[in-house]
Curated annotation (Swiss-Prot):
Induction: By sucrose. It comes from Arabidopsis thaliana (Mouse-ear cress). Residues 18-43 are annotated as: Disordered. GO terms for cellular component: mitochondrion; nucleus; plasma membrane. One of its GO terms (biological process) is regulation of carbohydrate metabolic process. A lipid is attached at residue 2 (N-myristoyl glycine). It is found in: Nucleus. Keywords: Developmental protein, Lipoprotein, Myristate, Nucleus. Signal peptide: none annotated. Promotes plant growth, especially at the vegetative stage, probably via the regulation of phytosulfokine (PSK) signaling; PSK are peptide phytohormones acting as growth factors. Together with PSI2 and PSI3, required during vegetative growth and reproduction. May also have a function in carbohydrate metabolism. Disruption phenotype: Reduced response to phytosulfokine (PSK) in roots. Small rosettes and dwarf plants as well as early senescence of older leaves. Reduced fertility, premature senescence and severe dwarfism in psi2-1 psi3-1 plants due to reduced cell growth and proliferation as well as premature leaf growth arrest. Plants missing both PSI1 and PSI3 are dwarf and contain reduced starch levels; these phenotypes are partially rescued by sucrose. This is Protein PSK SIMULATOR 3. The lineage of its organism: Eukaryota, Viridiplantae, Streptophyta, Embryophyta, Tracheophyta.
Length: 649
């Protein structure tokens, strides 16, 4: 019956746009022509006018789609997303067009399958579902449901924070500070280069690398979208980077978009923290419930009810934050804004730096490999500098663990040069501890901040949860966002940095020697050896203040000087011969109460007279004398410098 009616009407309802019934000359079809013999028309008179009107509308629709098909044939799609207008406007119009086309196709299929009795209803449905045709395409107010960011909101928020930091670093105020202050700072000039163009080229390369990381994350998000127009965005970014055309108000729009996104990021950070609280409450609730189920007591406490109330309230908080944060935002909505930000950053970096980083470095790739960042040594050298600065602050009380840690962390080149440099190091005049610290401060005052920036840069916002756990107000400038790579040890020359570190270690050795000497109340043996005489150690002037020697010590010294040694007898046997007498007065024994609570020291001075008997000078360091007698003053093998007496810290 349906096929019979379609033939009698002269309309092909199976056509895609239902326009085959319209005459080629534009005339209206004659629905009232005479029927063949034996057949009667089933068309109601009032129905004929409605069908003529609907066919006219379908004819107009056919003309529109035929125009779009001819346009599509001229522009062959090569897989690269094309945005002839602003990306957000073009994407919305394309999305609306796809929705309208799908509606027309679906309605046409329904119309071809429908019977004559439902023809009017189907045509009415087709007319009511069609949207107005505008210059931007078919606009539809239907939002895509079920395509929210969800758990990806935290990763997207981390990406938005990166874009905010990059835009902030490209502001006019920060660029003026970069060119007027940072590039002329002592740390950059001494460790990196004093060529302004070379420094500017390094900064431009760093900014483009940050943009590449940000755009790479945007491309990754686009490939996960259900809408195919967001796929392969890298091709689109490559094309617009080669055809950079300035656009009006692009900067103002991008800054406004970033500010709006940062508000959502703030709510997302709060959501991250509240989800952790919710997880702990759920875990506590389940544990409490199991305990009460396994409990022998029939009466249950109020603890489970309280936890249940807190859990219910926390779920409401999480639900509210999900609506305010990026969690409930649509994928396409956020992608539009991220694409606009990438477009703005491409133009902004080009306007500020031009093609500075495109020019090859004069020193070539070999010089680039000698820098600490590409070699992966920036953070290690920064830790060494921080250790030196810490030891300078407490030079008089350096522990053996701190000394060993610093020595073991030194690079091989510095270890090889340390021995010869310490032996050849001479001071024109005797310097006090304050003067030595002032001399070291001339280098440390610019070297330590560079090391600190390196540490901060390595512990910056990298992981998804770090920015959320800090609890920072992301609507303001993030902490550490103003640190540029040029301010760290990343671009520092390895050779220059090792020279400055070696100089600080030599001065540190001299400082520790002087600090220990002053702490004992007088000078001591100089640890700085002359290159002409490295074997003999000379005693310097007498100490300013002489410690009091007890009566027992004086008696022991007198007896030791009068005693005659037996030939061919070792020292230990010689002492054993006077065992009974030594037991009566034994202040030199480690088990004696005299020894307890006395601080140990590694310095010693022993005078010998022509008689061959050692005279122990307790005025210099009586603790070292005990170590020599007990033979516990032998240093570890790897400390060759300590064994020679050249290194005292």
């Amino acid at each position: 019956m349906g096929s019979f009616c379609s033939k009698s009407l002269g309309i092909n309802f199976g056509s895609e746009y239902s326009g085959s019934s319209v005459a080629d000359d534009g005339r209206e079809p004659d629905f009232g022509h005479s029927q063949p013999n034996g057949q009667t028309s089933l068309i109601v008179p009032g129905m004929r006018q409605l069908m003529v009107k609907d066919v006219k509308e379908q004819n107009q629709l056919k003309d529109v789609f035929s125009f779009r098909e001819r346009e599509a044939e001229d522009n062959f799609y090569d897989g690269i997303p094309t945005y002839t207008m602003a990306p957000s406007q073009k994407i919305r119009s394309a999305k609306s067009t796809q929705t309208a086309v799908s509606k027309v196709t679906e309605a046409s299929k329904l119309l071809g399958k429908a019977g004559l009795g439902r023809a009017k209803d189907v045509l009415d449905t087709l007319g009511s579902s069609m949207t107005d045709l505008s210059s931007g395409g078919f606009t539809s107010g239907v939002a895509t449901k079920g395509n929210e960011l969800g758990i990806l909101a935290f990763e997207v928020a981390n990406t938005i924070v990166k874009s905010s930091n990059l835009i902030e670093s490209l502001s006019k105020r920060n660029i003026e500070h970069l060119k007027g202050t940072i590039l002329y700072s002592e740390g950059v000039q001494n460790l990196v280069s004093n060529d302004f163009d070379e420094l500017l080229r390094l900064v431009a390369a760093d900014k483009r690398q940050e943009l590449q990381v940000f755009s790479g994350e945007v491309v990754r998000f686009g490939n996960r979208s259900k809408d195919f127009q967001w796929h392969n965005l890298q091709r689109y970014f490559d094309r617009i980077s080669k055809e950079l055309t300035p656009q009006r108000q692009l900067k103002e729009d991008a800054v406004l978009v970033v500010d709006q996104l940062m508000v959502l990021v703030q709510y997302t950070a709060e959501l991250y923290q509240e989800l952790q609280v919710l997880y702990r409450l759920e875990k506590d609730y389940e544990q409490k419930r199991r305990e009460e189920e396994n409990s022998a007591n029939s009466s249950k406490g109020d603890g489970l009810a309280i936890l249940k109330t807190e859990l219910k309230a926390q779920r409401k908080v999480v639900k509210s934050l999900k609506k305010k944060s990026l969690w409930s935002r649509g994928f396409e909505e956020v992608m539009e804004k991220l694409v606009d930000i990438v477009h703005f950053l491409l133009l902004e970096i080009h306007n500020i730096f031009g093609g500075a980083d495109d020019q090859p470095s004069k020193k070539g790739a070999a010089e680039y490999d000698k820098r600490l960042g590409p070699a992966g040594l920036a953070l290690h050298y920064a830790n060494i500098i921080v250790q030196i600065d810490t030891l300078v602050a407490r030079a008089s009380s350096i522990t053996s663990n701190a000394r060993d840690s610093l020595y073991q962390s030194l690079p091989p080149g510095i270890k090889l040069a340390l021995r010869s440099k310490i032996k050849s190091f001479n001071v024109d005049k005797e310097l006090s501890v304050t003067q030595i610290k002032d001399e070291m401060e001339r280098t440390l005052h610019w070297l330590v901040p560079v090391a600190g920036n390196t540490t901060k840069a390595h512990h910056g916002f990298g992981w998804v949860g770090e920015w959320a756990n800090t609890g920072t107000d992301f609507t303001s400038k993030p902490s550490g966002g103003d640190i540029l790579r040029i301010e760290t040890l990343y671009h520092a020359s390895k050779e220059k940095t090792e020279i400055y570190i070696l100089g600080q270690i030599i001065w540190l050795q001299h400082l520790v020697t002087k600090a220990k000497s002053d702490a004992r109340g007088g000078p001591r043996l100089s640890s700085i050896k002359s290159p002409l005489d490295t074997t003999n150690q000379q005693l310097i002037s007498e100490p300013l203040s002489v410690p009091i020697v007890t009566d027992e010590e004086q008696k022991m010294l007198q007896e030791a000087s009068k005693r005659k040694r037996t030939p061919c007898v070792s020292k230990s046997q010689d002492f054993d011969s006077e065992y009974s007498r030594a037991r009566k007065c034994d202040p030199l024994s480690k088990s004696s109460e005299y020894f307890r609570g006395v601080r140990r020291s590694k310095s010693a001075a022993v005078k010998r007279y022509s008689s061959g008997f050692p005279l122990l000078d307790f005025a210099i360091d009586k603790e070292k004398v005990l170590d020599v007698i007990d033979r516990v003053d032998v240093p570890r093998d790897y400390k060759a410098l300590l064994k020679e007496g050249s290194l005292s810290f």
